[in-house]
């Protein structure tokens, strides 16, 4: 009566990956990552008062902050820029602008180029 060999989620296996769906998923992941990266330092500071091990990790991080802080800023900046520019693209889609396949591919490439160029000008030049 029941077919044991059927896939659990056939909708994930029968379709090819599309660029628009991939960027939409990364938009959601970038929002969660941005929230986690911004909310975790105050929570870690609060938890460091309860545990000696957490306090030692915090002390190590603060003593090496000249190495950690620039990379932390770069990572948050890249995630923030991607999320904001992709959010603008989603607003354009909601207003039915650039919803055909050629425009979506062009907008995806433009999105990546903008994030790369802005980060290049911000941190290197």
Swiss-Prot record:
Its cofactor is heme. Belongs to the cytochrome b560 family. It is a multi-pass membrane protein. The heme is bound between the two transmembrane subunits. GO terms for cellular component: mitochondrial inner membrane. The keyword Heme applies. Membrane-anchoring subunit of succinate dehydrogenase (SDH) that is involved in complex II of the mitochondrial electron transport chain and is responsible for transferring electrons from succinate to ubiquinone (coenzyme Q). The gene is SDH3. Pathway: Carbohydrate metabolism; tricarboxylic acid cycle. Keywords: Electron transport, Heme, Iron, Membrane, Metal-binding, Mitochondrion, Mitochondrion inner membrane, Transmembrane, Transmembrane helix, Transport, Tricarboxylic acid cycle. This is Succinate dehydrogenase cytochrome b560 subunit. The chain crosses the membrane at residues 29-49, 68-88, 104-124. InterPro entries: SQR/QFR_C/D, Succ_DH_cyt_bsu_CS, Succ_DH_cytb556, SuccDH_FuR_B_TM-su. GO terms for biological process: mitochondrial electron transport, succinate to ubiquinone; tricarboxylic acid cycle. Heme binds at residue 83. Forms part of complex II containing four subunits: a 70 kDa flavoprotein (FP), a 27 kDa iron-sulfur protein (IP), a cytochrome B and a membrane-anchoring protein. It is found in: Mitochondrion inner membrane. GO terms for molecular function: electron transfer activity; metal ion binding. Its main location: mitochondrion.
């Amino acid at each position: 009566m029941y077919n044991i060999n059927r896939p659990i989620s056939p909708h994930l296996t029968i379709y090819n990956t599309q660029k628009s769906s991939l960027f939409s998923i990364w938009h959601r992941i970038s929002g969660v990552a941005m929230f986690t990266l911004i909310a975790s330092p105050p929570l870690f500071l609060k938890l460091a008062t309860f545990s000696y091990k957490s306090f030692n990790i915090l002390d190590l991080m603060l003593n090496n902050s000249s190495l950690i802080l620039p990379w932390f800023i770069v990572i948050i900046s890249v995630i923030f820029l991607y999320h904001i520019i992709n959010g603008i693209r989603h607003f354009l889609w909601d207003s039915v602008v650039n919803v055909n396949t050629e425009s979506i591919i062009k907008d995806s490439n433009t999105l990546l180029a903008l994030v790369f160029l802005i980060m290049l000008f911000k941190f290197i030049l």
